[in-house]
Amino acid sequence: MHPNVYIPDAFLEKIQTILPANLNMEDFISACQRPLRKSIRVNTLKMSVEDFVKRAEDKGWTLSPVPWCDNGFWIEADESVVPLGNTAEHMSGLFYIQEASSMMPVSALFMNDESYDAVLDTAAAPGSKTTQIAALMKNEGVLVANEYAASRVKVLHANIERCGVRNAALSNFDGRVFGGWLPEQFDAVLLDAPCSGEGTVRKDEDAMKNWTQASVLEIADTQKDLIESAFHALKPGGVLVYSTCTLSTEENQQVCHHLKETFGDAVEFESLDGLFENANAALTEEGFLHIFPQVYDCEGFFVARIRKHHSVEAPQVKKRMGKFPFVKASKKESEEISKQLHNALDIELPSESTVWLRDKDVWLFPDALEPMIGELRFSRMGIKIAEAHKNGYRWQHQVATALATGAESNAIELTIEEAREWYMGRDVRPQIIPEGLKTGKGEVLVKYQGAIIGLGKWVSNRIKNGLPRELVRDKNLF
């Protein structure tokens, strides 16, 4: 229980005025004082839901489906010895610990099983929705993941890497720049807007400590700027999903109505009634989902799906771009890199991607990124696959996380003890070496329970650990 949750009286008075007639304040307060149920989302870039459910059964985890996300589950697991974040399944990117209601905006974006070539996630960190989008895109097309706070870009990249995302390009800008810098560039835009966080008290009992009505109105002004910019960045015919983890109508319905008032018949609100069974329990008259915490026993949340019917005039913006530091590899260079990767690790380069070079670094960019090169300065694009040296290429960790599947001939299965040693940054001496696997020298993929966990190098009969230092863990491991 969270009986110490701080909820200002002025906020409760406000909720009383916006709470739907079929809900009551007692249930609202009671829900706010209950801790959230823990939830996870299976990362289908790495494992099917069916296989994950079997794995969960073997581990004694109890899963209950989240109705609005096909690969989302509430989970009951004994974390007294090993927290979920330190399980092998989490560390190898098989699942993401994500609040159930925060899975809803991405489900709304892909409500009709859409296929998008270019998607913008305007406020992406820490990466739960970014990785959810990448999985639904099947790592195809390009996903621009923007984060305004520079301090949060690092964790965004870490989660993208852990989950095997290779079609992302990261940027670090105020989300208000996209409408002017990349007008009508995206098939879909997610704006999970910064907000007053009124829906998060079940996760953070101090979430409302600094709440004031004045701060709500100030944030709403920013949200209106952000949604205008997001709409400008959207192609005609495209879909914008606007979401918050707050309850105030000023930050939700009124922001959407501001967009409609600004752009008129270019804006259509598409009803989310059919998103999942019983969605109508939170449906507004416009077709938005305004979710109070007692309705589905989750965080307070808001989601709107908006269609752009035709072009609107975008602001003219001057921008100064530095020299782009990458050059596209020649056909011969690409073929040589592809051949060496295949020979070394039995990995093929994916189609719809191109090799780019910067000094000795070898990168793989999604082809769909190319129209944006020179239009926006990215902090990171695609994946770094190698560094060139005099004897060939030194393959990088993201080759293992984003390109390997676990079925490669040059991959070795570790025991649980060896896998723990691996995650602690230590070299391993595998007890079981499959017949025909070359040892002694060269690089090798390592896996645990079939899931790739890294890339190492043979030194005689041991594998030199290639795990990046920032990923090394030292205690409470599976």
UniProtKB/Swiss-Prot annotation:
S-adenosyl-L-methionine binds at residues 123-129, 147, 174, 192. Keywords: Cytoplasm, Methyltransferase, RNA-binding, rRNA processing, S-adenosyl-L-methionine, Transferase. It holds the Pfam family YebU_pre-PUA_dom. The keyword Cytoplasm applies. It is found in: Cytoplasm. GO terms for cellular component: cytoplasm. The keyword Calcium does not apply. One of its GO terms (molecular function) is rRNA (cytosine-C5-)-methyltransferase activity. The active site is at 245 (nucleophile). Its EC number is 2.1.1.178. It catalyses: cytidine(1407) in 16S rRNA + S-adenosyl-L-methionine = 5-methylcytidine(1407) in 16S rRNA + S-adenosyl-L-homocysteine + H(+). GO terms for biological process: rRNA base methylation. InterPro entries: Methyltr_RsmF_N (IPR031341), MeTrfase_RsmB-F_NOP2_cat (IPR049560), MeTrfase_RsmB-F_NOP2_dom (IPR001678), Nol1_Nop2_Fmu_2 (IPR027391), Nop2p (IPR011023), RCMT (IPR023267), rRNA_ssu_MeTfrase_F (IPR023545), RsmB/NOL1/NOP2-like_CS (IPR018314). Specifically methylates the cytosine at position 1407 (m5C1407) of 16S rRNA. Belongs to the class I-like SAM-binding methyltransferase superfamily. RsmB/NOP family. This is Ribosomal RNA small subunit methyltransferase F. It comes from Vibrio parahaemolyticus serotype O3:K6 (strain RIMD 2210633). The lineage of its organism: Bacteria, Pseudomonadati, Pseudomonadota, Gammaproteobacteria, Vibrionales. The gene is rsmF.
